[in-house]
Amino acid sequence: MLKKLKILWVTLLAIFLAAFLLFEYMDEGLPKGEQGAEADQLARTMMASINDQAWQNTGALSWGYDDRTFVWDKKKHLAKVNYNEHQVLLDIDNRRGLIVNENPELSLEEKKEICHWAWRYWCNDSFWLNPVSKVFDPGTERSLVTWHGQKTLLVTYTSGGSTPGDSYLWILDENGRPKSWKLWVSIIPIGGMRFSWDKWVELETGVMVSTYHFNPVKTIPLHNPVGKTNLSDMFEEDIFTPLFSDSSALIPF
């Protein structure tokens, strides 16, 4: 018994020490930058490096993030989210969802929770797919920051998404393409955590996406990204038809 208690105390001490070191030596304050034309031009250069015009012409996408998979009808703002044992169709703009093959014993609150988490996963995981094309979204602020002698781009989202107020510092290569970014976001308590932007692939529509984001604590791979001009190029039948078949079955969340 004493041996087990000793192991427990050593484990707890190790966790506490690791947390202390993370906050003491890795937590960074949000850098200050200068807004203006130079920051906006750097943002446009970054967008051009991934062929943002091709992204605008991409009407449908599918990909995986961890154990979740997604289909996104970008033209109609609809999404299919598979997570855990759930399959959820989302009307993104109107915040309504439909649980495919739902358990009839689920309460309304449980259904709302399932749809809400599907939406949150879509917000996060679609952002990781291509945040570059969102640097001029309404509510964004772009600032030029000198980081280790290099000009970098700080983007703050003052509104929108599921976590407004988040900031990202883009570190670019000589062609303006992202090499990594540093995060100041509400879901990560340590400011300035850095993730790489590696393993770039070109989708069929011509847009470039990064599929590997290394960090010593948590590495994020994206799986099997596919981009098409239209959803009909991906599926013979419209997988979102059930969203519009019976409005009474839709769950607001």
Feature locations, PLM:
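Extracytoplasmic/periplasmic/luminal assembly and interaction segments
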Residues: 54-91
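Short, Lys/Arg-rich N-terminal segment immediately upstream of the first membrane anchor
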Residues: 1-5
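Interface amphipathic segments
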Residues: 86-102
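Short, basic/low-complexity N-terminal boundary segments at the transition from targeting/disordered tails
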Residues: 39-48, 52, 56-61, 119-127, ...
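Extended lipid/amphipathic-ligand handling interfaces
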Residues: 46, 71-74, 198-201
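N-terminal leader/targeting segments and the immediate start of mature chains
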Residues: 6-66
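Gly/Pro-enriched, hydrophobic low-complexity segments
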Residues: 146-249
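Flexible, processing/modification-adjacent segments and terminal tails
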Residues: 98-166, 187-191, 249-253
